[in-house]
Amino acid sequence: MVMLADALVKRMIEVGALKFGDFVLSSGKRSRVYVDVKLASTFPDILEMISEGMAAKLKDLEFDRIACVELGGVPIAVALSLKMKKPLVIFRKEKKDYGIKGDRIGEVKEGEKVVVVEDVITTGSSALSAARRVEESGASVAAIIAVVDREESGRNFMSLLKLSDLIEAHDSIQPTES
């Protein structure tokens, strides 16, 4: 697992998924570091590493379904669904007012155990919102897992990487001035 995490970090840095500057995160917080897992997940090798890493972390967990919130978690949840042969539900951020007017694509059945997948967790509000919706459907949350935990939520979420791992790796491969 360590080798996979190292390879994932290296590839994420190579494709420019770790950015430095002044950013406003979806949580509303400001940060000097942005982790663009959406960009990273557009590369098949990275997406495969993510799904393999998550599958390894979840291998001993009993669950029936994978859930995510649009948009960032979708490619990751789809890849994990394919890898683990588990059905998927995608929660919309807002209920549609056209078509079938749903708040999700797919279903959650009463009594199921569901794993919620996220791209990046900062405060955890998006993941916890999905977890609440799972529970409102009569199912239970078996786990919440993210590609990157920014370590700002005050909670211990399952993740493949911590933001500090990415920054440390980035700093170690940058040329130093002599």
From Swiss-Prot:
Organism superkingdom: Archaea
EC numbers on record: 2.4.2.10
CDD domains, sorted: PRTases_typeI (cd06223)
Keywords from the named record: Glycosyltransferase, Magnesium, Pyrimidine biosynthesis, Transferase
Binding site for 5-phospho-alpha-D-ribose 1-diphosphate: 92-93, 96, 118-126
Enzyme superclass (EC): transferase
Pathway: Pyrimidine metabolism; UMP biosynthesis via de novo pathway; UMP from orotate: step 1/2
Cofactors named for this entry: Mg(2+)
Any GO molecular function: magnesium ion binding
Family that this chain belongs to: Belongs to the purine/pyrimidine phosphoribosyltransferase family. PyrE subfamily.
Function: Catalyzes the transfer of a ribosyl phosphate group from 5-phosphoribose 1-diphosphate to orotate, leading to the formation of orotidine monophosphate (OMP).
Protein name as annotated: Orotate phosphoribosyltransferase
Species this protein is from: Archaeoglobus fulgidus (strain ATCC 49558 / DSM 4304 / JCM 9628 / NBRC 100126 / VC-16)
Lineage: Archaea, Methanobacteriati, Methanobacteriota, Archaeoglobi, Archaeoglobales
